[in-house]
Amino acid sequence: MSDSTVAASASASASSSAKSSLSDLRQFRINKNASSVVASPSRTERVPGKKRIQVMADSDSDGNDSQTPKKTKLELTVKEKEERYMAAAKISPHFDTMAIQESLSRTNWDVAASVRYLRENCKPKGHNGPLAKSKLKPRSNGISGGNFSDNDHSDDDDVKQSKDQVYDSDDSDSEMSTKMTGQRKKVFQFMNEASLIELQSVKTLSEKKALAIIDVRPFSDWSDLRQKLESIRMSGDLLNYAQELINKQNTVAAILSKCNNMVSRLEKAISNGAGIVEQPKLLSSGLQLADYQIIGLNWLTVMHKQEMNGILADEMGLGKTIQVIAFLAYLKENGLSQAAHLIVVPSSTLDNWEAEISRWCPELVVEKYHGSQDERRRMRGRFAKDGFTGFDVLLTTYHIVGSTPEERKMFRVCKLDYVIFDEAHMLKNMTTQRYANLITINARMRILLTGTPLQNNLLELISLLCFVMPKFFAKSIEDIKSLFAKKGKSDGDQDEVSQFQETQIQRAKRIMKPFVLRRLKKDVLKNLPKKLSLVEKVPMSSQQKIYYHELVDYYSNNKGEVCSSSERAGIAIMMEMRRIANHPLLMRHYFTDANLRGFSKRLANASSFKKTNEQYIFEELAVMSDFQVYQMMNKHEFYDVKIPDNLICDSGKFLYLDTLLPKLKAEGHRVLLFSQFTMMLDIVEEYLRIRKFGFCRLDGATAVNVRQDLITDFNGDDSIFVFLLSTKAGGVGINLTAADTCVIHDIDFNPYNDKQAEDRCHRMGQQRPVTIYRLISESTIEEGILMAAEEKLKLEKDITSNEKGEVHEQRCVVKLLTTALGLDKDQEEQLNNSLNNSIASPAK
């Protein structure tokens, strides 16, 4: 590619930096002048002491069999990839981060090819014109190819949009025409008729500016519009921003039209008898799918016949796993599988998936890709030689599928039929490295399973939809994100705000409809035992109250530190308050500095402790909580260091459990107790030992090969009264219906995590009514967290929150601390700015 070709294809917005950009690009094109960041293509760097598996052909290659070993390709280090990304970003600054990353991945990190791909296939930010057609061969990883009908392709030609802006600052006053055509007419109509909230959707338009525009309406013609904008000191660029918004709305309208067409096609296929599948004969004869599961199977078969990917979003506990197993059995029974299938699951559900497949369909041959690095290396060697053959299903975890460059390469290259993602809400953020890795898996079709498709905001749902149907949404993703990120901010006409939000809701529902199947337990499980949810506001113990109020008083009297200190800003302060609200031993009050000096001396002389400098050891102990100090000393066999039992049992929540647990045990109930914090679970363990209750425990540190044994033991052994679980590790994908009581010791900021946790026992197979206890420390920051969680739960019903998740979390923290510490408005704003700076400039 010549320099002139590059210059010709560059966007107008990048022309001012063309010379430096071409210089940056040239170093990647001409080997003899290449920058040192580019390794010579004649050799492949190897990490000393590590062997490479046989390299597999990339799916971009021209060969027919992507599993055939090919010549070794250039392998770049992470640093080299970062440098190439920076070079591409510098050359193409007007393209989205994800678009640049995807283009580099598609072109094997060739910067010149990546830049060409961007300019031919992707829209720069704010660009609305047509794009040149790409000459690159598409990859068969689900991003292009047979995941839906060609009639559904989201080409830019579908929405005719003008490349010319409606306002040009070089136009003279005499050139202002009263005659309007095309885009000007649409912008003029919008500026005359848009509501306050609609005007606020235009870039740079605040509520104050939008009100000023409404005050000078109506506009008689184009020149009147421009003159009145000038009279209220608003730039004509505002008209271009309005044009940009209208074009985005047109793009989304085109997508909605396509979605409606897809719904019509699906309905026609169903009415013509597509689907109508009964329980596959390959399923175990003694097991029977529920009626709604048969419907789910038929939905999957219709989607398969229409070559459409989908999201099975049944509420937690409705047996999504079983429906997928039945679908895979249907494919095998009818000879429809074109290759092996991949199922990607959280570590905690790996063994459960294997057990359920064996139980429901023993005919499906399962290969579990798991184990040590050496074991996986040997398996990769076999896959490199034979491909994914000899089995129907390859089962692995989210962690392992992207664990090493070799594994990412393997799943990008080897062909798969279906890839199924369990707990797919893990893909809700399209900016993460995990999302970028998983979207390159080379599968013909995709199915996502999630019981909570909506958690924080609409954009998370859009991330899932873009993952499941990438080509359908890819070229419009920035427009979709922009529109769904808008939120009605007016404090005025609430009917107007509600109408704006209702429009967003209806858009989201129409986009979702072809791709998502969601049923609720209350609608399909008529015989499921009832669930009673109780919020128990528990008073703190007397000493706990003293500690909590001391902390609040300290920060209330040092508001400057709260609002400005980067080290002890918002979240850290809130966490200290949460710790004391849960248990005093999560902070340090019992062990004095003098105690720590003595402990430091003993540890320095201990053969099992590596450090010998007493001062360093003291400083390390000084930042620990009482319980951490106790654990440290016991770890190194100083068993004389103890915390009295009365202090371990001294928290408001434990005092409540002193009444609740004996009553539950006497009545024959069994309990799941969840906490977000493993340190809190450590203290609960000590409490249960003191109270002589039998228990077992599962958290993120529990070995994967042990987890299923723990679940089996609890379900089969009535003597185990309490199962301790961390909310994240133990709250997804496991069946614990032997319990009928769930205690949420400390609630999560994200209430959907708690809902997942409680559904471990309230699900298919439960025979008894279920009771959920949420413990909230009275008059503490936990009451504010509960209110924030209840607001988020409205998403599931209304789909109304359209803010970015990170910003929403930050505002929650600011609001909670403002209330807890009595900050005034200026201090609240200062804290908000401090958190903004902290997020923008994280510590290195």
UniProtKB/Swiss-Prot annotation:
This is SWI/SNF-related matrix-associated actin-dependent regulator of chromatin subfamily A containing DEAD/H box 1 homolog. SMART domains: DEXDc, HELICc. One of its GO terms (cellular component) is chromatin. ATP binds at residues 314-321. GO terms for biological process: defense response to Gram-negative bacterium; DNA double-strand break processing; positive regulation of innate immune response; positive regulation of transcription by RNA polymerase II. InterPro entries: Helicase_ATP-bd, Helicase_C-like, P-loop_NTPase, SNF2-like_sf, SNF2/RAD54-like_C, SNF2_N. Its main location: nucleus. CDD domains: DEXHc_SMARCAD1, SF2_C_SNF. SUPFAM superfamilies: P-loop containing nucleoside triphosphate hydrolases. Residues 30-42 have a biased composition (Polar residues). The gene is Etl1. Residues 301-471 form the Helicase ATP-binding domain. PROSITE patterns: HELICASE_ATP_BIND_1 (PS51192), HELICASE_CTER (PS51194).
